[in-house]
Amino acid sequence: MLYSKPKQLVVINIYCDRILSIFPNGTLKLVNYSKLKDGAYAAKLMEGVSPNVPMRSGVLGVFAIVLEFCAYAALAAYAYQKAPLYGAILFAGTTFACIVSSAYHLKCGLAEYMFLKYGRDERAKGMMLDLMGSGASLRLCSLGMITFYITLMVAIITGAIGFPIWALVFTILPIFIVMFPLQIVGTLHIAAMVSMLGWMFLI
């Protein structure tokens, strides 16, 4: 059985992603992410934000990712009953994605915390950018999710796990394509959470 509170799961994930990018003076989007290198832009954008906000996002985000793992592991277990190979790949993909994305989410929250805590000046900006630039391998968290969904799509198309072909609508790709023009930070993660609502009706 999938996690029984999918709406709460989606809300927690979206909330944790969005409070890292929505500020009183504007919203950080993918298209202007590189502007964070400009200390004046970052300081103005995050003016008035408490350091507790990114830390709250970090802690709640990891909690949400744990719930996410439970949901996707349940989907992998269901697939394993029908096709063990596909199920094993799905489980490996979601395990890798959730473990690495937990570390990545905490790192992003800590980077913003340091910038806000130490005065939003050039030194604080340098500390933030150094931290965000470190541990580049953590960005591979999306690799696990991509592996998961490619495997799931193949399993659906081949009929190996018994889902109808229209179940492809609930995979992450259609939702990601719809959301991408919005340039929301955390689009892949949010799309993955929204897709989980669909699987509640199929399992």
Model regions and ranges:
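Hydrophobic, aromatic-enriched alpha-helical segments typical of multi-pass transmembrane helices
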Residues: 1-203
